[in-house]
C-alpha cells in the first residue's frame, strides 16, 4: 500500500508540475493583456501621449516577466529553433502573435550598468509581413509594430504608470510637430538633366551592419524626459532608438548600438562631470541652437567617448530643431547630428525627426517638392525632390509645410531615393569602413516589374509587380514615382499638378501593401471623382493627379521581405510615357444609374480619343463587370473587343444594385470605370399582395369553402 501510495504521489507531483509548466507557458496568451475601462484610470495623471482614438489595456507584469524570460538572444541557434511567442494588443480589440528574441541596442558595457533596460525584436505570426520592436524599461513597456495595415504603437497610459497602456494607430496620434524645423540644407549636388535621371537597382539584407552610436543629451532634455537623472534620460533614449532601429533594420539592414560610456554624455543632474552636478548652464551644449550644437557635439564626443570608440554621433535636446551633416558615419563629421523638440517623446520624435536627421547623416537628402512654410527657405533639395508637397516618407516634411502638407506625420518608410543614397553610403561608401557585419542568411527578394508603356493623358492606369523570395518570407510592395521637377527648378504652382506644363512628381507614396498592384489614382478617386482627385482631402494635399501633358513618368517598386532582423529589399523600374495629344480614354455608357435585365444585351460605349493610333496602338479592349461597386471585376464580358468605342455585351444572370463596367486596353495598363453604380434586376414581375382580395370569397359565398371544393386544387394523376 505504501508503494502504491508513493507511486500515486510521485505521479501526482509530476502531473502538477506539468500542469504548472503548461499554465506558465499559456499565461502570456490568456492573461498578459486585458482590456480595461478608461473610466477606472486616474483622470488627473500626467499624460505624454493622447491620440484621438485608442484602446486601453492592462498589463500583467508578472506574466510579461515570464514571457520575456523565455526570449532567446538574437542570432543564436535557439532564436532560430526555439523562438519565444508573445501576444500584443491591437487597437481593434484583437491580439496579434509574434515570435520574438532579445535584441540589445546598448553595448554590453552600458547594458551592465543598466541591467533593467531590455529591448526585443519580433516577427509577426498571424501577419508575417509585420515586424516589431518593443522594450521593457523602468518606465514601462513600449512597442512599435510596422505592418501594411498601418503602424501600431503601444505606450503607457500615463507617466509613472507601468500597468495601464494605450494601443493605437499612428494615424490617430496627435500632431506634436508644429514647432519643429529641420535646418539641413541641400549641399547642391550636381543635378542630372531630366532625360538622364536613372533608377539604379537597390538591394540590401544579406548583412546586418552594426554601428556604435554615441547619443548625447542636453540637461534640458534629461529634465524633460528623465526627471533630471541619467537613468531616466537613458531610458527615454533607448525607447526612441529601439523604434528607430526597427525601421532602419527592416528597410536598410542597419543597426545602431548605444556606446558603453553613453552615461557620461547624458548631462543630467546626477552626472557630476560638469564641475559638479550638470545643469542647463554648465553642460557643453547650447540647447536652443542646433547649428551651434553640431560643432559642440563633435568636440564633446571626441573628448569624452573618444573618436575611435564611436561610428556615428548625435545629440538630443529640447530646442534648436534638427540639423545634420550629410554622409557622416565612419567619417570625420560623424558627430554632426542634432534633434531637438520641446516635447521630445513619442513616435513623431522617433521617426519623423530622429530617424529623419540620422537619415541625413547616412546620406539622404530631403525628398519633398513643396516650397511653402518649412518646405521653403532653402530646405527643398533640388537633387531629390521626388514627393509632391510636403511629402510623406521619413526624409520628407509631413506636417510642417502648411498648405502643402500631405499628412500630419510621416509613414514609417524611406522613399526609394533615400534607400538608394543610404544603401550606397553604407555598403560601398565611407559608411562601409567601420561597420560590424553579421551574415543574416537572408537573400533579398527578386522583383520583376511590368515593363514600359505608352498611355493617353488623363486616364487611370495600374502597375503590377511580382516577386519571389527563396527564404519564403512574406513580401510587400511599394510603388513610388521617381520624377524630379523638370531641371530641379522648384515648384511654380500647387506642387501636385503638371497642368502648367511642368513635369513634376504628381503621385505620393503610400504604406507598402501585400499586393503588387498599384492603381493611379487610388480607386476611390476613380469611383467617386470621375478620375479627378480633389486637390485636398480634408486639410491635406491629396497628392494624386493624372498627368495632363506629354511626359515620361518613371516609377520604382520596392519589394521588401520584412525581416525584422535585417530586411531584404530589391527594386524594379517602369517608365510610363504619356501622349498629350491622346485621351482621356473614358467610358461613356453606362454612366448613369440605369437598370438592366439579366441575360440581355447592353451597349457599352467609350471615348477612344486617339488610343488606337501610334504610339499607343491599343487595338483591342477588355470589358469586365463588377457587382460590388467597382472594387473587383471578376466577370469578363468581352476578352478582346475592337477598340472602336462601342460593344454589345451580354449581361450575366446576376442581380445587383452596385454594378460597374471597366474597359481596359489589351496589352497595356490604362483603363476607365463607369462613373456611377447601375442595377441589374430581373424584369419578371413579382406577384403583389393587391391581388389577394380578388380571390377572397364574399360572406354569401361561405359554402364554397367546404371540403367539396378541395379537389379543384388537387393535381390530376
Mark where each language-model region is.
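N-terminal prosegments of processed precursors
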Residues: 23-158
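Fold-level signature of zinc-dependent metallopeptidase catalytic domains
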Residues: 26-33, 37, 164-324
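The catalytic-center signature of Zn2+-dependent metalloproteases
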Residues: 259-289, 329-410, 480, 484-496
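Ser/Thr-rich, Proline-interspersed low-complexity disordered segments
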Residues: 684-716
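Exoplasmic/lumenal beta-rich domain surfaces
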Residues: 257, 476-549, 615, 622-647
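Short, solvent-exposed loop/turn segments at the edges of extracellular beta-sandwich modules
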Residues: 560-567, 666-670
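Extracellular acidic, Ser/Thr/Pro-rich low-complexity tracts
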Residues: 466-471, 483, 561, 607-614
Amino acid at each position: 500500500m505504501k508503494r502504491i501510495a508513493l507511486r500515486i504521489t510521485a505521479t501526482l507531483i509530476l502531473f502538477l508540475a506539468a500542469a504548472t509548466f503548461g499554465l506558465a507557458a499559456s499565461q502570456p496568451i490568456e492573461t498578459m493583456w486585458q482590456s480595461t475601462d478608461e473610466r477606472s484610470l486616474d483622470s488627473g495623471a500626467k499624460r505624454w501621449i493622447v491620440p484621438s482614438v485608442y484602446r486601453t489595456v492592462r498589463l500583467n507584469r508578472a506574466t510579461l516577466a515570464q514571457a520575456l524570460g523565455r526570449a532567446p538572444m538574437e542570432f543564436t541557434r535557439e532564436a532560430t529553433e526555439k523562438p519565444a511567442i508573445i501576444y500584443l494588443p491591437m487597437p481593434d480589440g484583437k491580439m496579434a502573435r509574434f515570435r520574438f528574441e532579445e535584441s540589445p541596442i546598448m553595448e554590453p558595457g552600458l547594458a551592465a550598468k543598466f541591467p533593467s533596460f531590455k529591448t526585443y525584436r519580433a516577427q509577426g505570426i498571424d501577419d508575417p509581413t509585420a515586424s516589431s520592436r518593443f522594450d521593457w524599461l523602468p518606465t514601462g513597456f513600449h512597442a512599435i509594430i510596422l505592418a501594411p495595415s498601418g503602424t501600431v504603437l503601444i505606450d503607457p497610459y500615463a507617466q509613472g504608470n507601468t500597468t495601464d497602456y494605450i494601443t493605437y494607430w499612428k494615424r490617430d496620434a496627435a500632431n506634436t510637430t508644429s514647432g519643429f524645423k529641420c535646418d539641413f540644407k541641400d549641399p547642391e549636388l550636381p543635378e542630372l538633366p531630366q532625360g538622364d535621371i536613372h533608377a539604379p537597382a537597390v538591394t540590401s539584407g544579406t548583412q546586418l551592419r552594426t554601428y556604435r552610436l554615441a547619443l548625447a543629451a542636453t540637461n534640458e532634455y534629461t529634465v524633460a524626459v528623465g526627471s533630471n537623472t541619467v537613468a531616466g534620460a537613458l531610458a527615454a533614449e533607448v525607447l526612441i532608438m529601439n523604434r528607430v532601429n526597427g525601421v532602419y533594420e527592416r528597410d536598410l539592414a542597419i543597426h545602431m548600438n548605444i556606446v558603453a560610456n553613453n552615461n557620461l554624455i547624458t548631462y543630467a543632474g546626477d552626472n557630476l562631470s560638469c564641475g559638479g552636478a550638470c545643469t542647463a548652464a554648465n553642460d557643453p551644449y547650447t540647447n536652443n541652437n542646433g547649428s551651434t550644437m553640431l560643432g559642440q557635439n563633435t568636440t564633446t564626443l571626441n573628448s569624452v567617448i573618444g573618436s575611435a570608440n564611436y561610428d556615428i554621433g548625435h545629440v538630443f535636446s529640447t530646442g534648436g530643431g534638427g540639423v545634420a551633416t550629410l554622409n557622416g558615419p565612419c567619417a570625420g563629421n560623424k558627430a554632426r547630428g542634432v534633434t531637438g523638440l520641446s516635447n521630445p517623446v513619442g513616435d513623431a520624435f522617433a521617426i519623423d525627426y530622429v530617424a529623419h536627421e540620422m537619415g541625413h547623416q547616412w546620406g539622404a537628402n530631403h525628398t519633398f517638392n513643396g516650397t511653402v512654410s518649412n518646405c521653403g527657405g532653402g530646405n527643398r533639395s533640388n537633387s531629390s525632390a521626388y514627393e509632391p508637397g510636403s511629402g510623406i516618407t521619413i526624409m520628407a516634411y509631413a506636417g510642417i509645410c502648411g498648405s502643402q502638407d500631405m499628412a500630419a506625420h510621416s509613414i514609417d518608410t524611406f522613399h526609394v531615393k533615400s534607400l538608394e543614397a543610404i544603401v550606397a553610403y553604407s555598403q560601398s561608401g565611407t559608411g562601409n569602413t567601420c561597420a560590424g557585419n553579421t551574415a543574416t542568411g537572408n537573400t533579398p527578394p527578386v522583383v520583376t516589374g511590368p515593363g514600359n508603356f505608352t498611355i493617353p493623358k488623363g486616364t487611370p492606369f495600374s502597375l503590377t509587380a511580382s516577386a519571389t523570395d527563396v527564404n519564403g518570407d512574406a513580401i510587400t510592395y511599394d510603388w513610388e514615382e521617381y520624377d524630379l521637377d523638370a531641371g530641379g527648378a522648384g515648384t511654380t504652382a500647387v506642387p501636385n499638378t503638371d497642368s502648367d506644363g511642368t513635369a513634376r512628381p504628381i503621385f505620393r507614396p503610400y504604406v507598402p501593401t501585400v499586393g503588387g498592384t498599384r492603381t493611379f489614382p487610388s480607386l476611390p478617386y476613380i469611383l467617386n471623382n470621375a478620375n479627378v482627385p480633389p486637390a485636398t482631402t480634408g486639410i491635406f494635399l491629396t497628392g494624386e493627379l493624372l498627368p495632363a501633358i506629354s511626359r515620361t513618368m518613371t516609377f520604382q517598386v520596392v519589394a521588401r521581405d520584412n525581416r525584422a532582423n535585417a530586411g531584404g529589399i530589391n527594386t524594379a523600374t517602369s517608365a510610363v510615357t504619356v501622349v498629350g495629344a491622346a485621351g482621356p480614354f473614358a467610358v461613356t455608357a453606362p454612366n448613369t444609374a440605369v437598370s438592366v435585365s439579366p441575360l440581355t444585351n447592353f451597349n457599352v460605349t467609350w471615348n477612344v480619343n486617339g488610343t488606337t493610333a501610334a504610339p499607343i496602338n491599343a487595338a483591342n479592349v477588355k470589358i469586365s463587370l463588377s457587382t460590388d461597386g467597382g472594387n473587383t471585376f471578376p466577370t469578363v464580358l468581352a476578352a478582346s473587343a475592337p477598340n472602336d468605342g462601342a460593344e454589345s455585351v451580354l449581361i450575366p444572370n446576376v442581380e445587383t444594385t452596385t454594378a460597374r463596367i471597366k474597359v481596359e486596353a489589351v496589352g497595356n495598363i490604362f483603363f476607365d470605370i463607369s462613373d456611377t453604380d447601375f442595377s441589374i434586376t430581373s424584369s419578371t414581375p413579382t406577384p403583389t399582395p393587391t391581388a389577394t382580395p380578388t380571390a377572397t370569397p364574399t360572406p354569401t359565398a361561405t359554402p364554397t369553402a367546404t371540403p367539396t371544393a378541395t379537389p379543384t386544387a388537387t393535381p390530376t394523376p
